[in-house]
């Protein structure tokens, strides 16, 4: 039997670095939104190729805060519809619903498990204002075609990149830098996983970035002044320190995962077993 993902084995190699990071955390005494969060935000923005990265509590909150930010800036409003993949995790639907928007599920291509472009092109609903492609199993959605259609229809494009840390899309750009904004999860099972919960938003939009930075912290940008009706969804200082350590090995780990996936595709020949279309370039 092939063993399931062993998180202990993955994290044991970092024990010494994690201990040192914990000692630094205790010495600094910065428990909330300190230097470790700032460092990871800068590191991950640079890795993704975006101008901004905002650490939040989890992937669900990352998606919801993007929607809430766009509502504040008048690009979305309650009742607007959002196109999402029918084959995705429940958090995708929850984020849309919690933001007061309406999820519209669209069928996926059975070969890729990402948006079916024929079904997408057939959509004709003026109430749809945003498109949320999910890069499932680390395979980036067909973003070039999605962008063309979104520009024609005037849709916002938001990446659900919870399973696509380091995945490469159009023009060699990484997931997180392929749309107006992107949401990531650092749940322990992700290929960049924390030792608890965590998430982040990446974007090149300065207004959205600042808005989300406020929203995650009770709507506040300075102590005792709450500009927005916000949330409590901050990336944990200690998790940020651990993630910064693991980020250095992400490309190497992804390459190993791709090699394993290649092995399955080369050796599994059974009509009853459907594997995602291989995309071994990223």
Regions found by a protein language model. Give the residues of each.
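N-terminal "arm"/small-domain region of PLP-dependent enzymes with the aminotransferase-like
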Residues: 1-30, 35
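Pyridoxal 5′-phosphate
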Residues: 13-16, 76, 257
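Phosphate-binding glycine-rich loop
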Residues: 30, 34-81, 87, 94-98, ...
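PLP-dependent aminotransferase class I/II
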Residues: 36-43, 47-53, 60, 118, ...
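Active-site phosphate-binding strand-loop segment of PLP-dependent enzymes
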Residues: 111-194, 200-202, 207
